[in-house]
A protein has these predicted regions:
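Residues that line or immediately flank small-molecule/substrate-binding pockets and catalytic motifs
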Residues: 8, 50
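A short acidic, helix-capping loop that chelates divalent metal ions and anchors anionic groups
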Residues: 11-16
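Short, conserved sequence motifs used for protein processing/export or organelle targeting and
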Residues: 17-42, 51-171
């Protein structure tokens, strides 16, 4: 299981800019809204396996979705011992292979806005998302740069309909 925080940017104009927010994360959320036929974007939102969405504060729904996700078969994603390559195993689907770089832990002091004078603790906050290429169902290997100190990386295999086919992280 790989948990990542894609911080959206549409609240940035309300007195404080989230240092992890990005337009690409906002676009990703809007793509999920379209694919999952939600109709609108909102926060806090959790997407599980690219196929289920729920309000992030609904603990019972989140735990049920995570339990169901663990039972599903995934395409193997494994990192080499030297941390410089990742292999996507064989499977019956096709998808995009994505590389995510994220901050393991960060503390942010909020100066203004709704959370003024609060200190926020973030874990696995996405810093960048890039494409490694396409996966057509056959085993495939990609060269990668290992994570820097305080950083993690995740490799996701995602179908065109948004479903996660495989994932792994390296810290």
């Amino acid at each position: 299981m790989v948990a990542l925080g894609f911080h959206i940017s549409y609240w940035d104009g309300l007195g404080w800019k989230d240092p992890f927010s990005s337009q690409s994360s906002t676009d990703r959320q809007r793509t999920y809204a379209r694919l999952l036929e939600i109709g609108q974007v909102y926060t806090p939102q959790i997407i599980v396996d690219g196929s289920r969405e729920m309000v992030g504060s609904d603990r019972a729904k989140v735990l049920a979705a995570l339990h169901d996700a663990r039972a599903e078969a995934m395409v193997p994603v494994t990192f080499a011992a030297d941390r410089r390559s990742v292999t996507i195993g064989a499977g019956d689907a096709r998808g995009s292979v994505l590389l995510v770089r994220f901050a393991l832990e960060r503390t942010t002091r909020v100066a203004r806005g709704e959370n003024a004078r609060r200190t926020l603790q973030d874990a696995n906050a996405v810093e960048s998302l890039s494409s490694l290429g396409s996966w057509e169902g056959s085993p495939l290997r990609f060269a990668i740069e290992p994570p820097a100190a305080g950083e993690g990386i995740a490799v996701l295999v995602q179908a065109a309909d948004g479903r996660m086919l495989g994932a792994a992280k390296l810290q």
